[in-house]
């Protein structure tokens, strides 16, 4: 095999190993820091404001934009609130919802600095996680067979399948196809689309049930309402903020 072929095998093997480790980490440890989608994809999911309203410019490509300070009044931080329940958010890492979690965490901390907040990956059902991991190893094995020109079927007296002959004759295109299709199937298996919010032991929002992520104002109103139910709402606190009309 030429040096170029060895180099390509090494690159694809390394990419496959990274993909396997990423999937295992997301399902076993329930904490990931990958898969941040582009800003436009996030705005299509979370941007529920009209086009006529002004927004600030993001400092990073994956930044979730919020209203300008001149048209949005943030609430006063409630520093004296004690013994607050833990806010837990379980989100789909592979869907790119990590940035949504970070943004909503900021909103909650601005009003309730003493509120403990936790976030974790919302894992798919167990059988889907196992199938996705198995597909990662199968994909890696197929890439090695194709790039190495190996025919394992001969050892079992099964000859030389036509599809394998075609793959050996078109190694680069075949490997690209296997890699992309494998990733597509894996992502479809581990993607849950979840953004589930719990305050204490009570669930206050479910994207799986509602089909959408709450707006920042809804998010804070849900927290305020649940704190009131628990008898932990501070007295005379303002809501998340008010949108002011600009002339």
UniProtKB/Swiss-Prot annotation:
Xref: InterPro entries: Selenoprotein_Rdx-typ, Selenoprotein_T, Thioredoxin-like_sf
GO molecular function, one term: thioredoxin-disulfide reductase (NADPH) activity
Catalytic activity: [thioredoxin]-dithiol + NADP(+) = [thioredoxin]-disulfide + NADPH + H(+)
An annotated GO cellular component: endoplasmic reticulum membrane
Keywords noted in UniProt: Disulfide bond, Endoplasmic reticulum, NADP, Oxidoreductase, Redox-active center, Signal
Subcellular location field: Endoplasmic reticulum
Expressed in which tissues: Broadly expressed in neurons of nervous system including ADL, ASH, ASI, ASJ, ASK and AWB amphid sensilla neurons, in epithelial cells including hypodermal, arcade, pharyngeal, vulval and rectal cells, and in somatic muscle cells of the head, neck and body wall, and non-striated pharyngeal muscles.
Disulphide bonds in the chain: 92-95
Disruption phenotype: Viable with normal development, anatomy, motility, lifespan and brood size. Increased sensitivity to oxidative stress induced by rotenone and impaired avoidance behavior in response to the odorants 2-nonanone and 1-octanol and the pathogenic bacterium S.marcescens. Double knockouts with selt-1.2 are also viable with no visible phenotype.
GO biological process: cell redox homeostasis
Keyword check for Plastid: no
Top-rank taxon, per record: Eukaryota
PANTHER family for this protein: SELENOPROTEIN T (PTHR13544), THIOREDOXIN REDUCTASE-LIKE SELENOPROTEIN T (PTHR13544:SF0)
Job of this protein: Probably has thioredoxin reductase-like oxidoreductase activity. Plays a role in regulating the oxidative stress response, and odorant and pathogenic bacteria avoidance behavior.
Record-given protein name: Thioredoxin reductase-like selenoprotein T homolog selt-1.1
Species the sequence originates in: Caenorhabditis elegans
Upper taxonomic lineage: Eukaryota, Metazoa, Ecdysozoa, Nematoda, Chromadorea
Gene: selt-1.1
């Amino acid at each position: 095999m030429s040096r170029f072929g060895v180099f390509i095998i090494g690159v694809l093997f390394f990419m496959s190993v990274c993909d396997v480790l990423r999937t295992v980490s997301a399902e076993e440890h329930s904490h990931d820091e990958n898969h941040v989608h582009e800003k436009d994809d996030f705005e299509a999911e979370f941007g529920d404001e009209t086009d006529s309203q002004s927004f600030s410019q993001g400092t990073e490509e994956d930044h979730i934009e919020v209203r300008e300070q001149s048209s949005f009044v943030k609430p006063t931080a409630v520093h004296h609130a004690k013994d607050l329940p833990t806010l837990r958010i379980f989100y789909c890492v592979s869907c790119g919802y990590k940035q949504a979690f970070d943004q909503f965490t900021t909103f909650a901390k601005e009003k309730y600095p003493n509120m403990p907040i936790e976030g974790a990956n919302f894992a798919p059902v167990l059988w889907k996680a196992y199938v996705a991991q198995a597909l990662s190893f199968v994909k890696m094995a197929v890439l090695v067979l194709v790039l190495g020109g190996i025919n394992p079927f001969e050892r079992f007296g099964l000859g030389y399948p036509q599809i394998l002959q075609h793959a050996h004759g078109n190694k680069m295109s075949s490997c690209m196809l296997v890699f992309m299709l494998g990733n597509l199937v894996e992502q479809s298996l581990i993607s849950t689309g979840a953004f589930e919010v719990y305050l204490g032991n009570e669930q206050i929002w479910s994207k799986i049930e509602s089909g959408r992520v709450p707006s920042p104002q809804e998010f804070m109103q849900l927290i305020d309402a649940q704190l009131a139910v628990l008898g932990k709402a501070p007295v005379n606190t303002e809501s998340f903020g008010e949108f002011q009309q600009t002339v």
